[in-house]
């Protein structure tokens, strides 16, 4: 593209692999070296208005975290909601989104434009905005994030190399369990590099980055906050269900740290036991409210209590979903990912690769 800045397209093999975090961490490193950064997300993957609002809030959060002026940010050209998809399928929408993206990039003044790709390599194909189409249209270098599930993460990365060719400049393997780090360093990394794939970062799993704020859980559950509302920014790293006798419960509760405990509103014994361990919030189901002594103790310990209308099973399903779809919205997470990238991302190798074009 004539008169266009260099572009780095950051993608993933699956949603919620950590693209936003990688972008935040890498962008901050580059800014510290004096580079002017711009950021964009060409395609919004939200399926409804509520999800679209959250996605736009995430874009705004990244922009603010990087202190980018509005002129240095490009919001989605299209969202994958049902109405938009139907219009495209019916032929009512004939927009050439790839050309629209190219035009929007040409209006940016930056040393590097970081673009966040869709959830996988094929999403957006209906609109001409699949990952490979994006990379080709704007002549972008590609950085892929692979979330570790097993050593077979190499399968997806090898296939991506076949699809993307020389535009794939490197990969970051994210969320690696500590026990799998040696194998990933000694076997997976050399194997990928022997197949022409530069491994620029190996990031161990971090409980904080996979945690959810009490505030977010309250939002997802449509919960009523009964006390300690000023402490909704506490982070929840795990979920525990309290449905046993109190003697078993105390030992069980001690096994989890920074946890949310889901239990019945009438189980005063379990509520007290949970409050005496590392608990970030109580989530009470059913229609029975907690006793005054529970409210008082929770206030003393600065632990929020949430009351929900759902039954225990539904509540647990919603919380589990929240853990699976973690958003990067808390400053403490930004600090964490920036430290991880600063420590474990090979910036020198990245810059050398980018300089070669």
Swiss-Prot record:
Gene Ontology BP annotations: biotin biosynthetic process
GO-annotated cellular components: cytosol
Gene Ontology molecular function: any one: magnesium ion binding
InterPro entries in UniProt: DRTGG, DTB_synth_BioD, P-loop_NTPase, Ser_kin/Pase_Hpr-like_N_sf
UniProt xrefs under Gene3D superfamilies: HprK N-terminal domain-like, P-loop containing nucleotide triphosphate hydrolases
Family: To A.fulgidus AF1212.
Record-given protein name: Uncharacterized protein slr0039
Lineage of origin: Bacteria, Bacillati, Cyanobacteriota, Cyanophyceae, Synechococcales
